Amino acid sequence: NIETIFPYKNHLFIGSQTGVFIYDASQEERPVFKSNFSHATGCDPVVCDDDLAFVTIHGGTTCRGNINQLDILDVKNLSSPILLQSYPMKSPNGLALTETHIYLCDDGLKILDRKDPANLKMVAHFQDLKVTDAITLGDKILLLIGEGGFYQFDITDPANPKELSKIV
């Protein structure tokens, strides 16, 4: 029950309904299993950067389960991911990263400062945006999709994103 596949460098981070699986994809035709991190049953998008993986667990859907949270994993040692912190959420879906922030689709759009992963700080919360997926293009552009359509934002000032375009 795979939910997402996030390629990062020579690895694949695979979010499933029961956990995150990490594969070495140095040989593209033969990915090699490295490890997994099990979590409560739920839908599971995952994104990562150098040493951290960010996992949203969304319950109450076809994925079953009733947990709604954001997990942050230490993946310095890809063979042994460690849970650093869990944050309760309302109903998290997609998420995207920049070097300094997390853009999280949960009860609208939440923008979190991630400088200290053990103590995330909410920078902004836009409850009027009913979005379910997020993609960042560098540290400048955020793409969102949801009930209202497809959005493009300038995020050079993360606390004050500026809508550039919207397709309904």
Task: Indicate where each model-derived feature is located.
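Feature marking well-ordered beta-strand scaffolds used for ligand recognition
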Residues: N1-V168
